[in-house]
Amino acid sequence: MKTEIINRFISYAQVDTQSDENSETCPSTPGQLVLAQMLVGELKAIGMQEVTMDSNGYVMATLPSNTDKEIPTIGFLAHMDTATDFTGADVKPQVIENYNGQDIVLNEALNIVLSPQEFPELAGYKGHTIITTDGTTLLGADDKAGIAEIMTAMDYLIRHPELKHGKVRVAFTPDEEIGRGPDKFDVSAFDAVYAYTMDGGPLGGIEYESFHAASATITCKGTNVHPGSAKGKMVNAAKIAMELHGKLPANETTEETEGYEGFYHLSSIQGDVEQTQLRYLIRDHDRNRFQERKSELARIVEELQKTYGEKRIELEIKDEYFNMREKIEPVMEVVDIATQALENLGIVPNIQPIRGGTDGSQLSYMGLPTPNIFTGGENYHGRFEYVSVDNMMHAVNTIIEIVKLYEQRA
């Protein structure tokens, strides 16, 4: 099974599926359709039933029940796209057997080294088989590790009919990294009572709390005049943008917060004297504090509009997703079973809030409670991304154990 999961993961990682937030299609990039078609073929080859891919690239399949018991249908999901933060083209995964705990030279020519001195958690993987990048791309363990784990678990269950289980649905979705994963997901067609995204990080992670999330775009408009005769005439849009940013709490940024602490994240700033645009991510686990953050940003904009004129500054805020805890707590069985599965396997559950979101954040509000489970990856979205194959195997066993527990509890 170890060789199978390595081969699966590498074959997926080599397909460029980076999503594109500027695209209006679904999926946002053609590479995701290439991977989707691969997955359809593989699902059919291992014996899954009702394998479908719709016009938007959503892949679904069924593992039929093999018992007469009435068992709730559960689902497992992973996303096909990779992050926009770093290139996902021409990924060259490197497999390191029995990692020795020392520096890993990812790329000798470019002097790119993955070091436990810079990433202390790496030392904890001594003795593991790990997969890294070659230092020039991201790896795509987020979330192709999840795809490989779901596929391997389904393959195992099909090969072992003596393991009794209810109906299991799987889905592979596009465009999670740009926040559109569930936009065209057909919850009624998926037809599961509960689901799990395999989209987490290190071993043991179970997550059922996400941020409340919004994005803000602020456009500052100036008047450009020759610097030599600008007095009393020039209005510098870039300077307005700097003033605006300076009014936000300096200790409430991504670099200064952790755990349940929310933040304002200036994700991009572009412009000049004539026009400058700021883009922010607004995040908080608490709904009231989330609303306060949006209101505070609006208040700052209004304050500056009084100084520079209402037409000089425009603010657009869009809600993206909400904390799935509000939808999962009423049905905590879905979390309890995942926790029990880990304990049965001798894995210590690590239940933490997600400082981000998953497809499950939105799916939970669409009527499908969907907590998140670890995949074994680290350092997502960059050249130092890696995944432990040993912990990928633990994730496979976790899926199998969850399926078994639903049958046993029926």
Swiss-Prot record:
Q: What class of enzyme is it?
A: hydrolase
Organism lineage reads as:
Bacteria, Bacillati, Bacillota, Bacilli, Bacillales
- Name of the protein: Peptidase T
Name the residues annotated as catalytic in the UniProt entry: 81, 176
Which Pfam families does the record match to this protein?
M20_dimer, Peptidase_M20
Record field: catalytic activity: Release of the N-terminal residue from a tripeptide
Q: What does this protein do?
A: Cleaves the N-terminal amino acid of tripeptides.
SUPFAM superfamilies recorded for this chain?
Bacterial exopeptidase dimerisation domain (SSF55031), Zn-dependent exopeptidases (SSF53187)
Its Gene Ontology molecular function terms?
metallopeptidase activity; tripeptide aminopeptidase activity; zinc ion binding
Q: Which InterPro entries match?
A: ArgE/DapE_CS, Bact_exopeptidase_dim_dom, Peptidase_M20, Peptidase_M20_dimer, Peptidase_M20B
